């Protein structure tokens, strides 16, 4: 979901209203994409996977992004509401990993959570600056966007919590998310609708409706498949040992970096 949200920010940059908008969205995109690559690198190291495999070697069905980000924003108000909900949801899950029995994972999520604090400040500022017309657009967009955000917390089984990899349970992450919705309700001057249970078939592992995937157009934007894009892409390595080392010496783990220690 961070991967997709980062591309949302990249796409929306030209629609910013001021230079601070442009710079903040560029910084937020950089954070989301950088954090995504750090997480993928961590997983590849932890499970001895080929380098870059998780970014470039998966199909659309393998991407477990939140349904909230499937549909592009129809207007500025819709974008601001969606960005608020996505940032709040991601923060609520990241906070749940702080204090994990896996120290490296805990440190990484704590750092990401701290960086996300500034994202939420930016989004709060956008909400406060909405015109009356934009506020009405945001109010119109909120019910469906909020329903999708809430559904994302339906984890199905909660093995990560049971094994103390994530100290917070799924319900605690959801409660943290709900507590943060006050700023949204205040900015839009309305009450929040009650949560409704998802009535369709739900895939708890992917946290999406059963059989669904992000739209093909969005996937093409996130990971272009054109010949030109693939030519410009760094080729996949069969293993980390296949990477070219310009200094002709083996790679060493950076002992000063705490986030990837096991």
Question: What does each model-identified segment do?
Answer:
Residues 28-57, 123-128:
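Conserved alpha-helical segments that form or flank metal/cofactor-binding pockets of metalloenzymes
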Residues 22, 26-29, 73-84, 106, ...:
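Amphipathic, non-membrane alpha-helical segments in soluble helical-bundle scaffolds
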Residues 68-122:
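Internal, conserved structured core segments that host functional sites
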Residues 56-83, 100, 133-134, 145, ...:
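Acidic/His metal-coordination segments adjacent to aromatic residues that form catalytic metal sites
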Residues 3, 30-37, 84-88, 110, ...:
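Generic structural signal for well-ordered, non-transmembrane alpha-helical segments
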Residues 137-262:
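Extended, helix-rich structural scaffolds rather than catalytic motifs
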Residues 107, 119, 124-128, 132-140:
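Charged, well-structured binding/catalytic surfaces in domain cores that contact anionic ligands
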Residues 5-27, 89-106:
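Helix-loop segments that flank and shape redox-cofactor active sites
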């Amino acid at each position: 979901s961070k991967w997709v949200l980062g591309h949302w920010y990249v796409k929306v940059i030209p629609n910013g209203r001021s230079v601070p908008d442009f710079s903040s969205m560029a910084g937020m995109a950089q954070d989301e994409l950088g954090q995504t690559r750090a997480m993928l690198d961590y997983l590849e190291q932890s499970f001895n996977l080929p380098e870059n495999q998780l970014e470039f070697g998966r199909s659309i069905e393998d991407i477990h992004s939140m349904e909230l980000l499937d549909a592009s924003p129809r207007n500025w108000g819709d974008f601001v509401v969606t960005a608020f909900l996505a940032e709040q949801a991601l923060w609520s899950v990241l906070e749940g990993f702080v204090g994990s029995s896996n120290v490296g994972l805990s440190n990484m999520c704590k750092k990401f959570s701290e960086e996300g604090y500034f994202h939420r400040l930016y989004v709060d500022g956008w909400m406060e600056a909405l015109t009356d017309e934009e506020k009405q657009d945001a109010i119109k967009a909120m019910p469906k966007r909020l329903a999708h955000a809430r559904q994302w917390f339906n984890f199905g089984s909660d093995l990560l919590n049971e094994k103390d990899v994530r100290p917070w349970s799924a319900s605690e992450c959801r409660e943290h998310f709900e507590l943060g919705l006050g700023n949204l309700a205040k900015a839009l001057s309305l009450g929040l609708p009650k949560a409704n249970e998802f009535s369709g078939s739900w895939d708890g592992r992917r946290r999406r409706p059963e059989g669904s995937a992000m739209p093909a157009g969005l996937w093409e934007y996130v990971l272009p498949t054109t010949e030109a894009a693939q030519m410009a892409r760094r080729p996949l390595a069969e293993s980390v040992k296949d990477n070219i080392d310009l200094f002709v010496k083996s790679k060493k783990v950076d002992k000063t970096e705490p986030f990837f220690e096991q």
